[in-house]
């Protein structure tokens, strides 16, 4: 025991002496080491835990297209004053377009002295900020006759922060209506109300409410969150996933870029099965690329090599996935005279986004091929060869699991 104590005491004394010792470090500046790339530091975005809808994407209406459930209407409810009635039900006929799978039909019996309301609670509340102006838009048709108002209220509905009378003469054809509301108070848990004082039916779809956005981009991002991303000065933005790229159960649940561009009413959205909720794809391919541009960062696009969690396309049949990748690159990089470059210009961005970095697959080549992908190296080569043949300056990356590195 005494010997152990002596050793311990000696160690403590040695440590104390060492802490007071002078240490010299010689640096040979004439012999630098490996040059470190300035592009190593970047950010990665994946729609997990509502990182897009309800997060960075500025849309305030939750379940805006009524697609989140086949039977119920999550985040929406109705209310009626005494003497009024309102009924809401999902319908799947006479829809706005082929991208929309459902709409909401309201049957209303109200009057100015007894109104009826459709209410949306937003994503855990709508943030009403005094002096802030919100842009409302929605599509509607029906037989309704009477007045309509849009409001922001507190959660109980007994305090109005913003209100506007809508010039909405509802007719038989789908029509887009727009309005603005300016809040006169602050409430992080506010709600949106559409208030009716007449009678008839209204069929609604794509009800949208936007606050001001980062750099005033249409269909843009929350300025507070996007500014924080800007402040860290990332050199690249990796998107859109992650497992989000691949989806689960079927290839329809994967991220398909061409379904995420254009007007929001033309985006069908998809089931984000990996993370257990539906996404509107309002934050789509253009929005990711625009984010990278606004952050002065390079986009790093992750493409699917032909798989989804629970299934895959055989390696000898992946040409459609390669075509999808090549079309995405043409949309991002092609001239306006090209098919997809012209579509990019039509959607508001004639100048190329210039994707230089491409990640081919996500966490592929798992030890158990059934879990992810067989023949990953062959898949990688097929993609890389196709990309470099048309875009020789594009840098292709792989993302493997540890046992293969």
Regions found by a protein language model. Name each.
Residues 22-281, 293, 298, 313-319, ...:
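Extracellular and organelle-lumenal recognition/adhesion modules and their flexible linkers in secreted
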Residues 49-50, 243-246, 305-309, 362-367, ...:
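Solvent-exposed loop/turn segments at secondary-structure junctions
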Residues 284-294, 339-348, 383:
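Structured alpha-helical segments in the cores of large, soluble enzyme domains
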Residues 298-302, 359:
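Short, well-structured secondary-structure segments
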Residues 398-404:
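Conserved small/polar residues in nucleotide/adenosyl-binding loops
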């Amino acid at each position: 025991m005494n010997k152990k104590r002596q050793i311990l005491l000696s160690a403590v004394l040695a440590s104390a002496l060492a802490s007071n010792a002078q240490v010299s470090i010689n640096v040979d500046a004439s012999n630098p080491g490996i040059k470190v790339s300035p592009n190593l530091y970047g950010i990665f975005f994946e729609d997990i835990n509502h990182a897009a809808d309800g997060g960075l994407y500025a849309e305030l209406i939750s379940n805006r297209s009524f697609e989140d459930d086949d039977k119920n209407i999550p985040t929406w409810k109705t209310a009626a004053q005494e003497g009024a009635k309102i009924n809401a039900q999902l319908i799947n006929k006479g829809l706005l377009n082929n991208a929309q799978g459902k709409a909401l039909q309201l049957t209303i019996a109200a009057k100015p002295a007894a109104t009826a309301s459709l209410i949306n609670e937003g994503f855990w509340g709508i943030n009403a900020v005094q002096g802030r102006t919100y842009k409302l838009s929605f599509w509607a048709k029906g037989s309704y006759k009477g007045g309509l108002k849009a409001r922001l209220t507190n959660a109980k509905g007994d305090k109005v922060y913003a209100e506007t009378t809508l010039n909405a003469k509802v007719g038989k054809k789908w029509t887009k209506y727009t309005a603005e509301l300016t809040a006169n108070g602050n409430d992080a848990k506010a709600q949106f109300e559409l208030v009716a004082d007449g009678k008839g039916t209204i069929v609604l779809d794509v009800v949208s409410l936007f606050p001001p956005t980062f750099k005033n981009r249409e269909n843009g991002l929350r300025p507070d969150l996007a500014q924080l991303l800007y402040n860290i000065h990332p050199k690249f933005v990796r998107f859109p996933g992650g497992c989000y790229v691949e989806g689960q159960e079927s290839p329809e649940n994967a991220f398909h870029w061409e379904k995420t561009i254009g007007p929001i009413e033309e985006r069908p959205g998809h089931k984000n099965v990996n993370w257990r909720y539906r996404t509107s794809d309002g934050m789509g391919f253009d929005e990711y690329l625009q984010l990278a541009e606004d952050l002065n960062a390079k986009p790093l696009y992750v493409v699917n090599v032909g798989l989804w969690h629970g299934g895959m396309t055989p390696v000898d049949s992946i040409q459609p996935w390669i075509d999808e990748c090549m079309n995405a690159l043409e949309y991002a990089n092609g001239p306006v005279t090209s098919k997809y470059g012209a579509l990019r210009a039509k959607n508001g961005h004639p100048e190329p986004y210039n994707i230089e970095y491409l990640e081919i697959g996500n966490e592929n080549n798992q030890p158990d091929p059934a879990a992810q992908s067989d023949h990953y190296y062959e898949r990688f080569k097929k993609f890389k060869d196709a990309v470099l043949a048309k875009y020789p300056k594009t840098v292709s990356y792989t993302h493997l699991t540890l046992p293969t590195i």
